[in-house]
């Protein structure tokens, strides 16, 4: 039997899965989800909260330190640093796609502390 390695399969219909599918466009992807797109996902339960170092007083190093401290000893520091360094760019990508983040009267993102 021949194996076809040209298929891209994304499991999950939350923000990460759908964003990945959009970033891979125009490639075709197979999206596996247990519910309708966007419903019943961790993204929905998180009320669109995203942890990213986008504040004036935030930094990659402080965000990474916080992540490692609350990670229960299972954080891969290299992967966490890669994700955190790219976080602001991914937030900007989401904004350009029309994700309705909460903003203040100056159209600046409203930031909150994430639980941990």
Label for each model-derived stretch:
Residues 6-31:
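N-terminal Rossmann-like FAD-binding beta1-loop-alpha1 element of flavoenzymes
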Residues 1-5:
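A short, basic/flexible loop-to-alpha-helix module at the beginning of a structural domain
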Residues 34-116:
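Conserved N-terminal/central alpha/beta ligand/cofactor-binding core
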């Amino acid at each position: 039997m021949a194996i076809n390695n040209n298929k891209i399969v994304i499991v999950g219909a939350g923000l990460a899965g759908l964003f990945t599918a959009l970033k891979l466009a125009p490639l075709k992807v197979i999206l596996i989800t247990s519910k309708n797109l966007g419903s019943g996902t961790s993204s929905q339960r998180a009320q669109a909260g995203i942890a990213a170092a986008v504040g004036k007083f935030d930094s990659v190093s402080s965000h990474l330190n916080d992540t490692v401290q609350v990670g229960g000893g299972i954080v891969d520091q290299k992967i966490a640093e890669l994700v955190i360094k790219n976080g602001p760019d991914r937030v900007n990508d989401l904004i350009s796609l029309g994700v309705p983040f909460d903003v203040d009267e100056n159209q600046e993102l409203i930031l909150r502390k994430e639980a941990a």
